[in-house]
Amino acid sequence: MCVCLSIAIAIAIAIGSHKRSLNPKSSSVATMFLRWLGIVFFATHIPATLLVDAQALLPAYVFPKFARKMLENFIEQYNDPLMSAAMGSGGSADRRWFLSLVATELLIQLPFFFVALYAFVARREWIRVPLVAYGGFVSATMVPILNELALAEGLGAGKRAALLMMYVPYLVVPAVFVVWGCRRERLFAGGTDDGGRGSRKKTS
């Protein structure tokens, strides 16, 4: 319930933050919230990808022992049908499609995480179009993943709900970025843009 409420608030802020009718203080608060949402999202996604998700594709010896143990405990506790099948420790169906999505996460998304994290910290406006492209791509890839978790056989209601609560933010937050980027010409109002082009436009 808390996750759903947070998601609803984030989407509402993303949609409403573009409106000219908002007073400057309210608009500033919305922008600050979305900026910090992005910083936290990308900053936490980097270690999650490198230490957890990458284990589905790369050999075990490249990961520290604590990371391997953490994933083992996660699979044992929540019986994640996707990660367990990807790691060869169970699963009821062929998960090659899931491995292909993990590959795109490592090859495409991971480099973008560093770029986006820098852009959000430094308030770089050039991130808007790449952010929309990223958000649309990731939102689409999360649909089959959530569908698999929702319909997987042999998964108890409690574990299914817990897994969905963990995975759903990785659909919703990118979707919020899409809405935000499409509704705003400048994401970080009053922030620093790339090369100061906004300032030159005002003075020309």
Please describe what each predicted stretch is:
Residues 25-31, 189-204:
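Transit-peptide-like, low-complexity N-terminal presequences
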Residues 33-65:
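N-terminal signal-anchor transmembrane alpha helix
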Residues 57-80, 188-198:
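Interhelical loop segments of eukaryotic multi-pass membrane proteins
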Residues 101-116:
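Hydrophobic alpha-helical transmembrane segments
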Residues 109, 133-148:
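Hydrophobic alpha-helical membrane segments
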Residues 113-128:
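Juxtamembrane helix-break-helix junctions at the cytosolic face
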Residues 154-166:
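Non-cytosolic membrane-interface motifs at loop->transmembrane helix junctions
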Residues 169-180:
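Hydrophobic cores of alpha-helical transmembrane segments in multi-pass inner/ER membrane proteins
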